[in-house]
Amino acid sequence: VKKGNRAIGRNEAIRNTTGDIIACSDAGCTLDRNWIQEIVEPFDEKNVNVVAGYYKGLANSIFQKCLIPYVLVMPDKLNAKNFLPASRSMAFRKSIWKKVGGFPEEFSHNEDYVFAQKLKSIKAKIVFAKDAIVYWMPRKNLKEAFIMFFRFALGDTEASIFRLKAVLILTRYSVGIISLVLFVLFRYYFMFYVLGSIFLLYCFWSVFKNFVYVKNWQAFLMLPLLQLVSDIAIITGTTLGLLKKYG
């Protein structure tokens, strides 16, 4: 067995296939009974190179229910035209896999996103199959969630991918830290009240944007907590990625 990261494993498996169409999912995901039929059906059209399937969270606790909208694209926010395939639920022709050089083996945390960006850059014909569903099991606690977000951010930075959300988070906290330093140095008490108000609004916003997916009173505590944990994980992951890349 060839040793290595997920990308190495995926590429080795694909090299040893004999078929033209490769269907792919992740460990820990449960496939819908019709998944394979739905994910390969669009290939009846010869010009289709890639099929992006969909995914849903399989929550067993309120924590997992709150975590899902921080990780997955929720149905009401779905844009089928711009939906990129993820390794949880995707299929592609072996020829297009060869054309982009396979999954990037130098990346261990987000190889499927880099792979999808390569497909997009060569204008591969990508079709979204909303009924090709896999069920994803969310992380079970804050520690596991932190590590997941941290690895996402680290992987993106290593691949020179800077998502708008990550940039906004870094900007948000940089302004907050500068404002806090100004308060400590110059005793700008007005700044203290402003920061406190902004923090409370930020917590309220985290509930407002995601409560509809949870609909449980415990979400009023859990959603702000997850917002802060994911923010800190993204900041630390991005910072470490930058240090490794340019330090």
Question: What are the roles of these predicted feature ranges?
Answer:
Residues 1-6, 56, 81, 105-106, ...:
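Short, acidic/glycine-rich phosphate-metal binding loop used to engage nucleotide
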Residues 1-17, 38, 87:
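Glycine-rich, basic loop-to-helix element that forms the pyrophosphate-binding segment
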Residues 22:
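Short aromatic/hydrophobic "clamp" motif used to bind/position activated sugar donors
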Residues 25-27, 104:
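Active-site acidic Asp-centered loop
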Residues 30-64:
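Conserved donor NDP-sugar-binding/catalytic core segment of glycosyltransferases
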Residues 57-59, 73-95, 108, 114, ...:
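A recurrent flexible, glycine/aromatic-enriched loop bordering the glycosyltransferase active site
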Residues 104-164:
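Catalytic donor/gating beta->alpha subdomain of glycosyltransferases that bind UDP-sugars
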Residues 172-246:
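Membrane-embedded multi-pass helical conduit in multi-pass membrane proteins
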